[in-house]
């Protein structure tokens, strides 16, 4: 059952887009969601499921923003955010540039373009990953590039 909410409201978000799911025998992102389902077991509202990329996904209609899932996440990739701000960084990778891309094809690479472009000063790059200060963000949409595209599976190609 969906919870009727007044806008703005709080809900959990998983800071991983799923590109870290590696092919068998290859190393994936050490900072992303591992699909352990601890968050699912903890959520009393059935608001979390594992998506087709093996990553936890929150249904904002069901989530009440209690933060129970965030407390049990072993990777610390779940946090509660203000849903008035629709811009979120769905990445927790701490590697920089090519090393990050090697682990995850949709990783934030810590280049700082978003930080330089944000006129409100709401975005900072910390540990090679963009972080949005929601209390400052204007949700202007200028940096929709932060909403990373769908991941593709990594696979080893042999010739």
What are these regions (language model features)?
Residues 1-35, 40, 46-67, 79-110, ...:
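Ferredoxin-like iron-sulfur electron-transfer modules
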Residues 74-77:
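Anionic-ligand-binding alpha/beta catalytic cores of soluble enzymes and soluble regulatory domains
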Residues 146-152:
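Conserved small/polar residues in nucleotide/adenosyl-binding loops
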Residues 152-153, 157-159:
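Positively charged, low-complexity/disordered segments
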């Amino acid at each position: 059952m969906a919870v009727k909410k007044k806008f703005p409201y709080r809900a959990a978000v998983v800071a991983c887009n799923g590109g870290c799911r590696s092919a068998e025998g290859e190393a994936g992102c050490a900072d992303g969601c591992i699909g352990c389902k601890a968050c699912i077991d903890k959520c009393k509202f059935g608001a979390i499921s594992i998506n087709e990329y093996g990553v936890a996904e929150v249904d904002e209609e069901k989530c009440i923003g209690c933060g129970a899932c965030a407390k049990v996440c072993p990777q610390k990739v779940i946090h509660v955010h203000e849903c008035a701000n629709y811009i979120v960084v769905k990445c927790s990778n701490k590697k920089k540039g090519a090393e990050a891309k090697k682990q995850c094809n949709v990783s934030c690479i810590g280049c700082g373009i978003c930080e330089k472009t944000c006129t409100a000063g709401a975005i900072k790059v910390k540990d090679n990953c963009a972080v949005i200060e929601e209390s400052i963000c204007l949700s202007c949409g200028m940096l929709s590039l932060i909403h990373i595209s769908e991941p593709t599976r990594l696979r080893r190609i042999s010739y």
